[in-house]
């Protein structure tokens, strides 16, 4: 019975994430519209509320094309696997009951984000297009570089908390949010999340000016829609994780969803305001700026933990 309830809970979560992704795309188009001093989509339904659903119908009813020289099986399955991974990562969502919230949630998150690299790489390689391959290689290098900083930031909090469970982040932030005394770390985390999810200003995998459309250049209709869904699902997850780790929000309060919306809005706001970074500067930022900073904070947290333990015993 418990297994059945957990299964139903996770299916409901996946459906809600999908609906959230639909409205996140609408929010993005609206916000970008107002940033560029124009209206966003406002024709379909009331104020364009049904626009994402008409987009979905359009994308999934289009003809599925594939390049003759592509490695068809890999080409076909990499978007599906990509979406599967970005939905699987939601299983580590810190709920107390009826979901798979487990003690090693942080480790699970790191494992799944590492696996996400392969889908992009395989999608780029199997298309058998130079543009797609270059985009895939860029995405892999970028994701691996920024994952180091993400892992170190998480590790520093784990040293402080002494547990891999996301639920413990709530308990430790009952009186003060981590963002208060780790503001620089919060900014590093946010920038790393932008790089992880291939968003502006780090969207080199999809650099239109250089690579046509990057690793998804050969994808159309359903395949493109699945890659798109995976990207926006991971944006929502990263926003959720930011509010859990730094803003200490209890997942059962309405404030948690408000914070999640604000962080998602920041993702869109950055896209509307910042130009694309230069690739060498991106790598410079990852290895010479973010890595030393997260290492310094790691040692700082180890020192704090040792100090607390020495005071106790």
Swiss-Prot record:
Chain's gene name: mt:ND1
Record's function text: Core subunit of the mitochondrial membrane respiratory chain NADH dehydrogenase (Complex I) that is believed to belong to the minimal assembly required for catalysis. Complex I functions in the transfer of electrons from NADH to the respiratory chain. The immediate electron acceptor for the enzyme is believed to be ubiquinone.
UniProt entry tagged with the keyword Electron transport: yes
Family of this protein: Belongs to the complex I subunit 1 family.
Bilayer-spanning residue ranges: 7-27, 73-93, 104-124, 150-170, 175-195, 226-246, 250-270, 293-313
GO molecular function, one term: NADH dehydrogenase (ubiquinone) activity
Subcellular location per the Swiss-Prot or TrEMBL entry: Mitochondrion inner membrane
Protein name in UniProt: NADH-ubiquinone oxidoreductase chain 1
Bridged cysteine pairs (disulfide): none
PROSITE patterns (alphabetical): COMPLEX1_ND1_1, COMPLEX1_ND1_2
Keyword Lyase: no
Gene Ontology biological-process annotations: aerobic respiration
Catalysed reactions, as listed in the record: a ubiquinone + NADH + 5 H(+)(in) = a ubiquinol + NAD(+) + 4 H(+)(out)
Membrane topology of this protein: Multi-pass membrane protein
One term under GO cellular component: mitochondrial inner membrane
UniProt cross-references to Pfam families, sorted A to Z: NADHdh
Annotated keywords: Electron transport, Membrane, Mitochondrion, Mitochondrion inner membrane, NAD, Respiratory chain, Translocase, Transmembrane, Transmembrane helix, Transport, Ubiquinone
E.C. designation(s): 7.1.1.2
HAMAP family hit by this protein: NDH1_NuoH (MF_01350)
């Amino acid at each position: 019975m418990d297994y059945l309830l957990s299964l139903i809970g996770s299916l409901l979560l996946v459906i809600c994430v999908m609906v959230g992704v639909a409205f996140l795309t609408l929010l993005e188009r609206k916000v970008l519209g107002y940033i560029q001093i124009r209206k966003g989509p406002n024709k379909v339904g009331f104020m364009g509320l049904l626009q994402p659903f008409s987009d979905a119908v359009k994308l999934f009813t289009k003809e599925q094309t594939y390049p003759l020289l592509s490695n068809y099986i890999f080409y076909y399955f990499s978007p599906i696997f990509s979406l599967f991974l970005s939905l699987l990562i939601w299983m580590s969502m810190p709920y107390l009951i009826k979901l798979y919230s487990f003690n090693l949630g942080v480790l699970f998150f790191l494992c799944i984000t590492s696996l996400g690299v392969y889908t992009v790489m395989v999608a780029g390689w199997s298309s058998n297009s130079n543009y797609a391959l270059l985009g895939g290689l860029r995405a892999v290098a970028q994701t691996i570089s920024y994952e180091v900083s993400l892992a170190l930031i998480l590790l520093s909090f784990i040293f402080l908390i002494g547990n891999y469970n996301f639920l413990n982040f709530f308990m430790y932030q009952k009186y003060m949010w981590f963002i208060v005394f780790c503001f620089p770390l919060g900014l590093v985390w946010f920038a790393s999340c932008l790089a992880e999810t291939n968003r502006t200003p780090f969207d080199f995998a999809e650099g239109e000016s250089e690579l046509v459309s990057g690793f998804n250049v050969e994808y159309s209709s359903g395949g493109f829609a699945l890659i798109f869904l995976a990207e926006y699902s991971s944006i929502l997850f990263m926003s959720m994780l930011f509010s859990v780790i730094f803003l200490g929000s209890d997942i059962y309060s309405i404030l948690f969803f408000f914070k999640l919306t604000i962080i998602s809005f920041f993702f869109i706001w950055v896209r509307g305001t910042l130009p694309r970074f230069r690739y060498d500067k991106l790598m410079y930022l990852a290895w010479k700026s973010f890595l030393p900073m997260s290492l310094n904070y790691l040692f700082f947290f180890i020192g704090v933990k040792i100090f607390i333990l020495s005071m106790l015993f």
